[in-house]
């Protein structure tokens, strides 16, 4: 790895810290440069523009989540489809939903992508990582259909995206609200309730 690539990765790591702490709105390239102790021109040279930097941060953060989810998925391939999807849902909730800083970042990212009108090409790597995570859940679902532990719910993609968005949105709403509703115990109880609803919906009780 050359010096330029090392410097770019260093700036990227600093940018992730800033975005996780402060969100995306209101954070400028100058703010990132200051945090990394680099010139603004260097930050632009590494990433081109702010949108590209934000998307690279999002990709990097989701890659870390994806890799950890994959470890859990591959470790439990011998389990039934229902057990796999239950384990994945619980782990996803712990890894993604219970991470308040990441939930806030995702909320800020959604708003940013709409405002900046990111093109399909610009989002390609980001969307590909989310698809890889979805594919693991889909694999568990399909196995459950074969081994009889999961019932056919029709459109699994629709259910998956509704379920994951519900979990993430719950965390985001409670995080934004603050106060007593933001206690770890309260958040975890609500997440557990949603997980139980989702996994019960899958179960084949015949």
Language-model segments: residues:
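Helix-turn-helix
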Residues: 10, 14, 18-56, 60
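N-terminal intrinsically disordered/low-complexity leader segments
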Residues: 1-6, 73, 206
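Amphipathic alpha-helical packing segments from all-alpha helical-bundle domains
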Residues: 67-70, 117-147, 157-161
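C-terminal peripheral helix-coil segments that are non-catalytic and often amphipathic
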Residues: 91-94, 135, 139-147, 161-206
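Amphipathic, non-transmembrane alpha-helical scaffold segments
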Residues: 4, 54, 58, 62, ...
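Amphipathic alpha-helical segments used for helix-helix packing
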Residues: 96-120, 172-176
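Hydrophobic alpha-helical connector segments
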Residues: 56, 71-101, 157-163
């Amino acid at each position: 790895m050359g010096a330029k690539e090392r410097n770019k990765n260093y700036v990227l790591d600093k940018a992730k810290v800033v975005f996780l702490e402060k969100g995306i709105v209101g954070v400028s390239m100058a703010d990132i440069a200051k945090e990394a102790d680099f010139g603004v021109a260097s930050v632009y040279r590494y990433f081109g523009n702010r949108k590209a930097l934000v998307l690279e941060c999002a990709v990097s953060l989701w890659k870390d989540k994806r890799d950890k989810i994959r470890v859990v998925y591959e470790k439990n391939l011998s389990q039934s489809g229902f057990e796999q999807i239950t384990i994945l849902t619980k782990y996803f909730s712990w890894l993604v939903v219970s991470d308040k800083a990441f939930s806030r970042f995702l909320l800020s990212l959604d708003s940013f992508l709409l405002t900046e009108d990111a093109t399909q090409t610009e989002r390609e790597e980001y969307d590909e990582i989310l698809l890889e995570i979805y594919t693991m859940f889909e694999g568990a679902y399909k196995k459950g259909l074969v081994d009889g532990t999961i019932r056919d719910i029709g459109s699994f993609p629709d259910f998956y995206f509704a379920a994951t968005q519900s979990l993430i949105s719950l965390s985001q709403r409670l995080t934004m609200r603050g106060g007593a509703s933001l206690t770890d115990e309260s958040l975890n109880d609500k997440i557990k309730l949603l997980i139980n609803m989702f996994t019960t919906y899958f179960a084949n009780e015949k």
